[in-house]
């Protein structure tokens, strides 16, 4: 059974250092979120069923700073492998969001939009776009540099993507203080909505909820 040790250096510190190196700017905010794993119920999460989740000690962290050119630039440093760099404009995100809206054909029959195909920039940029439109970020937001560092191995069932999503949202909000439970529930909903609108890999809502709301003690029932 594979085991992953907790790194000695905080993930948020590594994200901030990488952000400064790659963008030349000091991050305005950093945030992190834990790994998650499903105990039972993940197959009924989509239908609103009860899910039992746990969180781990490994974390993903995000550092952010503003841009003024309407672009979301993403720099991802995974637990294993080479860094990835991608970008997307807020205008392109708006067009992708429009394409995902349901419509009707000439006979009035519903037309189901195609599944999203977005990669790294679309997933992370989609969180920015959705937070703006759900009034969690100012409509004056004109782009962002976003650097993600993760200690959570991909494909291990530990919610590496969900942890990164949550860390991005918290950093964008400048969530230095504790958020109350209703706001945490709203942020989880926004993360899931964004990922399912823009990203090729769909989200498990319960992972976002657990990463935001679990105390880390015992099982989180969602």
Each predicted region: which residue ranges?
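ATP-binding N-lobe of GHMP and related small-molecule kinases
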Residues: 1-162, 166, 170-184, 190-199, ...
């Amino acid at each position: 059974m594979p085991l992953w040790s907790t790194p000695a250096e905080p993930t948020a510190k590594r994200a901030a250092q990488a952000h400064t190196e790659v963008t030349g700017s000091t991050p305005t905010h950093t945030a992190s979120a834990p790994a998650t794993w499903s105990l039972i119920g993940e197959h009924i999460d989509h239908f609103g069923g009860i899910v039992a989740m746990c969180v781990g000690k490994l974390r993903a962290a995000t550092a952010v700073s503003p841009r003024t050119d309407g672009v979301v630039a993403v720099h991802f440093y995974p637990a294993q492998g080479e860094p990835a760099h991608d970008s997307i404009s807020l205008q392109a995100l708006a067009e992708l969001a429009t394409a995902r809206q349901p419509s009707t054909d000439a006979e009035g029959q519903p037309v189901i939009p195609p599944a999203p195909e977005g990669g790294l920039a679309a997933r992370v940029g989609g969180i920015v776009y959705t937070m703006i439109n759900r009034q969690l970020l100012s409509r004056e937001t004109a782009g962002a540099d976003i650097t993600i560092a993760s200690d959570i191995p991909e494909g291990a069932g530990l919610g590496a993507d969900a942890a990164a999503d949550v860390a991005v949202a918290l950093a964008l909000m400048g969530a230095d203080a504790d958020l109350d439970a209703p706001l945490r529930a709203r942020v989880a909903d926004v993360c899931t909505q964004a990922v399912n609108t823009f990203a090729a890999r769909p989200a498990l809502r319960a992972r976002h909820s657990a990463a935001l709301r679990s105390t880390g003690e015992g099982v989180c029932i969602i």
